[in-house]
Amino acid sequence: MKFPTDRPVKVVMLGAGGTGGYVAPYVFRLLHMLDRPARFVVCDGDIVEPKNLDRQNFVPADLGENKARVLAERYSTVLGMETEYVPSFIEKLPDLMELIEPKEWELNPYSTKRAKEMVLLLGCVDNNKTRQLCHQAFHQSEELIYIDSGNGKYTGQVVCGVRRNGRT
């Protein structure tokens, strides 16, 4: 499968803790290097606690702050890239569908040609309920790239799905 290289990109990441906290800087760098419009939305309703400092990508100055906000502000400041964040858990399908709705962009200010964003949903959550929500959104989407990751103490997995033209 080949993806167009001129379409704008939108990445929506659910979860900014153990997995999301380490995935975020790489996503920021990749989007920063693209030669096309890109948006990154980080979503998490959790706050940074002392127990998170040992295994998550946070520092003591982040304690008590929302995880999504910390990551969005940290890396957008470093890379000079505007970022959105949602400081709450995404628990309802309509909310997730709204987040992954592609926006149309003008490709060139001298042309009327427009292109819809290519949307990537990153699941970096630690609960099955949200994974099921992402699965529902994936199957209801006309076009979506969905990458889900999960891990235990000694194991982990990554699953990827691609929908184009309403087909998986």
Which residues does each predicted region cover?
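Adenine nucleotide-associated cytosolic modules
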Residues: 1-168
